[in-house]
């Protein structure tokens, strides 16, 4: 059937130290590899409490138990507790993923700072944040990252330009409707060199609580989308969710996709499969576009058309 790329966003210290090893064990049992995108600097998850004033945020929180998934301690980082340095405290868990043969890349330096601010920050701030994450990644892994995936699907033009300057060939920084269509951005500086593979499938936290669905209801919905569907997809999961309380549901989802005949791959494997078609020079080019998607608060990078 199709290829479904497994992209793991790792946002917090707890997610890195607990969720990541859990996911690694599950993937090993299924004989699968995934792309793990790490937050490499301070964990300021508590700063996200100010999102309570954003439309839709309280509705999301009421559907998915933030305290249950993230833990009280994590929610106090940056508020009543100092934000721990994820890259320094969880480098061992990160290296284990690399050593196991999974693909590794950059998610962000400071997740909450990036997600809440980057859209309106200047190039100097943007590139300083990105350089910190690059330097830390190389320090931890001993090699440069091959891919990137924006925190909260938030970017700006300077960030996309930085990806090209780094030589990143493929990235996943936005959202799209189901059924993957790779594309490039038209920036003020010209057409981006890297290819975008947006997340095409809804995430667990966007499905749980809708029409009273629990996590297994979310699995059913995802499998309905991919049943007899020959189109490639990108699925984003989170170490804090699927790597912890939602792990049994994620295991059911993996089994379901394999039973449907899909090939579960890394972002790199997905990119190479599209490279092999010799069509990437002909893919669509679009301006950086913002929009909303169902059951997630706020605007994010969105593929149009």
Give the role of each language-model region.
Residues 1-147, 152-195, 213-235, 242-305:
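Catalytic alpha-helical scaffold of carbohydrate-active enzymes acting on polysaccharides/glycoconjugates
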Residues 196-210:
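Positively charged, amphipathic and often flexible ligand-engagement surfaces
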Residues 202, 240-242:
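Short, glycine-/Ser/Thr-/acidic-enriched flexible segments
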């Amino acid at each position: 059937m199709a290829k479904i790329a497994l992209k793991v966003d790792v946002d917090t210290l707890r997610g890195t130290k607990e969720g990541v090893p859990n996911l690694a064990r599950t993937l090993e049992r299924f004989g699968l590899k995934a792309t793990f995108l790490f937050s490499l600097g301070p964990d300021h998850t508590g700063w996200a409490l100010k999102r309570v004033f954003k439309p839709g945020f309280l509705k999301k929180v009421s559907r998915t138990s933030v305290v249950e998934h993230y833990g009280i301690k994590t929610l106090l980082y940056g508020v009543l507790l100092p934000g721990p340095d994820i890259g320094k405290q969880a480098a061992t868990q990160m290296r284990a993923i690399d050593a196991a043969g999974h693909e590794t890349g950059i998610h962000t330096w400071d997740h909450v700072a990036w997600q809440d601010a980057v859209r309106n920050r200047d190039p100097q701030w943007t590139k300083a944040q990105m350089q910190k994450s690059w330097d830390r990644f190389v320090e931890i892994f001993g090699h440069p990252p091959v891919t990137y995936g924006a925190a909260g699907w938030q970017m700006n033009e300077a960030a996309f330009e930085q990806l090209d300057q780094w030589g990143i060939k493929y990235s996943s920084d936005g959202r799209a409707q189901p059924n993957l269509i790779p594309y490039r951005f038209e920036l003020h500086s010209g057409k981006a060199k890297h290819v975008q593979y947006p997340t095409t499938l809804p995430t667990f936290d966007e499905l749980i609580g809708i029409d009273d669905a629990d996590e297994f209801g979310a699995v059913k919905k995802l499998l309905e989308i991919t049943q007899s569907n020959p189109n490639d997809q990108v699925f984003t999961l989170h170490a804090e969710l699927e790597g912890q309380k939602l792990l049994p549901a994620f295991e059911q989802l993996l089994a379901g996709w394999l039973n449907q005949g899909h090939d579960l791959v890394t972002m790199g494997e997905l990119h190479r499969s599209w490279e092999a078609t010799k069509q990437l020079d002909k893919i669509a080019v679009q301006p950086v576009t913002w929009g909303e998607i169902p059951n997630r608060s706020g605007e994010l990078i969105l593929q149009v058309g």
